Amino acid sequence: YLEDFGDIFLPENKNSKESIFAVQTSDYEDDHTTYGRANWSIMLNGCWGMWSCGWDFHKPSQNLVNAFKTENGLPMFEHYNDKIDYPVNGQVSTQKWDPRLFHTVGMPTFPYKYESEYMQTVANSRTPNTYGYYTSLKEVPQRSKGETFNGSWQAFATADYVFRYTDVMLMRAEALVELNRLDEAQDIINDIRQRAANSISKHIDYAADMC
């Protein structure tokens, strides 16, 4: 699999060794068509005010953000949702987070999809009083890469994954659990978790102290 979790969701890696089965898309500049064969299912997920037609759909919930809390390097299975928490860029906190949060959820005060020239603010939420200030990151490219649809509406050529390599690894781990081969299953799960723990320096070094 790819060494950094964040690389999975960048368009340039959409057919990497991480991808087992994915719905294919293309940019109009790559396939020489008028409009490309974009992923229309995610066309409205661009961050409000960040893209030419970002409608801020597919909003991450506070419950999802809370689920990324960690304690001593492990998920907080029982008390993660006891109170509302969220990281703030540059603010010291005793609460630690799974690095995958910063690859998954766009949050005010942080770079949008790793790019410091595009900082996300509270103004980048279309309906904050209803749905909050978070935005989804996995479905969109970096802002500097631009949109991939040559028309009045935005669309992206990001991959629509059905199975990733790590999904297959987890299926194997689950089968090993059923066979009572728990040590082997644990090794696979820990391998995946270690990849997540290491996915800091390349893209989200600004969040290193929070993980």
Predicted segment positions?
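Short, cationic low-complexity segments
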Residues: 37-67, 123-132
